[in-house]
Amino acid sequence: MTLKTLTATLVASLAFAPLAHADITIGLIAPLTGPVAAYGDQVKNGAQTAVDEINKKGGILGEKVVLELADDAGEPKQGVSAANKVVGDGIRFVVGPVTSGVAIPVSDVLAENGVLMVTPTATAPDLTKRGLTNVLRTCGRDDQQAEVAAKYVLKNFKDKRVAIVNDKGAYGKGLADAFKATLNAGGITEVVNDAITPGDKDFSALTTRIKSEKVDVVYFGGYHPEGGLLARQLHDLAANATIIGGDGLSNTEFWAIGTDAAGGTIFTNASDATKSPDSKAAADALAAKNIPAEAFTLNAYAAVEVLKAGIEKAGSAEDAEAVATALKDGKEIPTAIGKVTYGETGDLTSQSFSLYKWEAGKIVAAE
């Protein structure tokens, strides 16, 4: 066979060969290690299950979806490193980050490199207030959930003494500031307003002050590691105050740390999506893997569904900006948390929060 004949044969064979599809890779930036790894596990489980279910049905635009994990350990610097890895790997879409303190710096890195992120859990208002076009969420904001908590206190603890404590982070301080604004506007001024440092174990100075001030309600802006310890130390001091917080107290690790002292703690979280028929397929897929259909897990599942919808609307996974624009067309997107629509900021156009309570290691409705 001559070289000319061989070349012609190869060209002909390539012309009739089926085109190979490139995988669509979604990066997951989450705390897979560290003190808030429990949240990372929930988000990873939700996102991976959604990817698996999508692939069972043919993928996105006929292409297989792959989830690539990047551990941020709940630390902003490590989050930036994870974001740079995602960018270096040529990934255009990200689920996460999980915590607001990590999500804000990561969003800047991703924006500079044309990567679209959908966070299932980062609730700080500042995340979507900075004019970035590449940030969306499948959760509400801290100002929304803190307002729900403050109105609950104004209604049920009128004329009682309130303390506000935060962990100095974007999430915790954001919650505390928003809670204070609504509380003060409603006529209650807190008697204690203090902060703790994540990683600290001894809150004796704070708990002693709370007891001496005869505080009835402690609003805590922060996550479960410190929240559980605070509950236990208040209980040990016989400071009979009700703890109220945000969705950072929704994890079972909060109960594991606080044990019985965590009983009666009230927290805000997204209204129960499992009550909607929209969540059934996701809940069934999770149940098949023995994974509870918890709020953060369903939010992560929904984040993958949002990316799928955006890519299909745009007709391609090549341009993340085009996908982001397509998602903000005002049309409903069916997800595991219900039908969602997005405004120009990347926030959900509607999001409801409910109040829950810890009782004997179980989460029940607070009202």
UniProtKB/Swiss-Prot annotation:
Keywords noted in UniProt: Amino-acid transport, Periplasm, Signal, Transport
InterPro entries: Leu-bd, Leu_Ile_Val-bd, Peripla_BP_I
Listed SUPFAM superfamilies: Periplasmic binding protein-like I
Disruption phenotype: Reduced uptake of amino acids Glu, Asp, Ala, Leu, Ile and Val by bacteroids that lack this gene and the genes aapJ and braC from the two ABC uptake systems of branched-chain amino acids. Pea plants inoculated with the triple mutant bacteroids are defective in symbiosis; the plants are yellow, have increased numbers of small pale pink root nodules, dry weights similar to uninoculated control plants and 30% acetylene reduction compared to plants inoculated with wild-type bacteroids.
The keyword Translocase belongs to this UniProt entry's keyword annotation: no
Biological processes, Gene Ontology terms: amino acid import; branched-chain amino acid transport; isoleucine transport; L-leucine transport; valine transport
Name recorded for this polypeptide: Leu/Ile/Val-binding protein BraC3
GN (gene name): braC3
